[in-house]
Amino acid sequence: MEYRYETHCHSSQCSGCAKSTSQELVRAYHAAGYAGLVLTDHFIWGNTAVDKNLPWDQRMKAYYQGYLDAKVVGDELDFDVIYALEHAYGDGKEVLIYGVELDFLLANPDIPEITLDEFVDRVHAAGGIVIQAHPYRDRYYVNMAVGPRADIVDGIEVYNACNKPGEDPQALELAKTKDYIITAGGDIHKASDERIGMAGIVLPYRVHNSKEFVAAMKAKDHKFLVNGNILDTIAEADLT
């Protein structure tokens, strides 16, 4: 058996740019044949829908609510819902944080004050991994003079279904420079997006939570879903 998982998507509960709820995303991905999704809503410095004036504990619980809502539907459909987050750290650059949960966020109320390096160290200490999201995305809000943090991340998102031509090939070249974990993701923001089904990873077994997902990524047991095709290696992909 092969099980498809979305590694990068956003819900309207937590991401200001998203158009669908996490429950709607679960139903859409289930209908598209996925076994599960990883919900990676924008965190404190990103395009968040969560009130930044809330006390830290309430704010973090709000960031977790989209996941809890999605899991209710996921459990009904026997569909895996996994919590993660997308962290903007400056200059329009972002990393995907996998393997931490609400308890980690509540225990680290100084996250807004610490550097990315310190944040990554804490994620690693908690057993998580950090993936550079769309490292060469070129948009008006991204400072292209600032490169990705390839020195501290565990992996590279090589294929992003929302990227423009030319952006993913650069990510692939970066991924070749080290034994990185490589991911592919849709970066989907609405349940009606026709790109659902185009991106993700494919595993020979199911993963039910963030710890199991991280273990699978560290083991590199996954294949890649790129442009709707299942590939053994990312090098096989047409990223142009």
Where are these regions (language model features)?
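A short helix->loop->beta-strand "cap" motif at the edges of active sites that frequently abuts
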Residues: 34, 79, 178-180
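Short polybasic/polar patches that bind polyanions
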Residues: 30, 75, 176
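Active-site flanking residues adjacent to catalytic metal/cofactor-binding acidic residues
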Residues: 7, 40, 85, 133, ...
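Extended substrate/RNA-proximal surfaces in nucleic-acid metabolism proteins
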Residues: 2, 43-157, 162-163, 218, ...
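Non-catalytic positions within long, well-ordered alpha-helices that form the structural scaffold/packing
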Residues: 30-33, 124
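Charged catalytic cores and adjacent phosphate/nucleic-acid-binding surfaces used
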Residues: 1-15, 21-27, 91-104, 121, ...
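Ser/Thr-glycine-rich phosphate-binding loops at phosphate-binding pockets of nucleotides
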Residues: 11-12, 35-40, 44-48
